Amino acid sequence: MAEERVNSNAVAVSTDDIAEYLRFAQSLVRQVGKELLSRFRTDLSVDDKSTGHGFDPVTDVDKKVERVMRDAITRQYPAHGIVGEEYGDQPGNGLTWVIDPIDGTRAFMTGMLHWGTLLGLSDGLRPIIGTMYQPFADELFWGISTEAGYRHGNNQTTIRTRCCKTLA
């Protein structure tokens, strides 16, 4: 799990830094979403990345999009680390980006609308930001420690929760 692979020492970040990281993440997932949509429901090259039992598919699109995301992160934040699904971990200064280029590869491969791109940032102990983009619906979900939101096209809504004392 990615949480086990990030730095064990938390890195302090300011509110302004968090806002910048969130803007960057939102822009990047939307950017790669265009590439994903152009390849959705097309012929894909698929490999099995499992190490034994079962089938763990990875497509040429997974690899390409993760490479694009890694390159963008490295250009913008060269000191940050990266953990991704398709390539090895890249150590950094304690701030670590966590990438899943296609969360729902099987759905993507079969033309089903149950996939998206995940991008998050950890300070070494906790998540700082998280984004999930579904390009086929132009839906972006995001969260930081103090708020969360949903954007569809140009319309944005704050996501709220309420206390739940029991689950049953």
Question: Predicted segment positions?
Answer:
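Glycine-centered loop/turn positions within well-structured domains
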Residues: 34, 80, 115, 138-139, ...
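Glycine-rich active-site/cofactor-binding loop and its immediate structural neighborhood
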Residues: 93-136
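Acidic beta-strand-loop-alpha-helix segment within the catalytic core
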Residues: 120-168
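Short, function-defining helix-loop hinge/capping sites that tune catalysis or transport
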Residues: 70, 89, 108-111, 142
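Flexible, active-site-adjacent loop/turn segments at secondary-structure boundaries
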Residues: 42-44, 56, 106-107, 113, ...
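Residues that scaffold the ATP/ADP-binding catalytic core of kinase and kinase-like folds
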Residues: 39, 107, 152
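N-terminal subdomain of lithium-sensitive/metallo-dependent phosphomonoesterases centered on the IMPase/IPPase/PAP
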Residues: 2-102
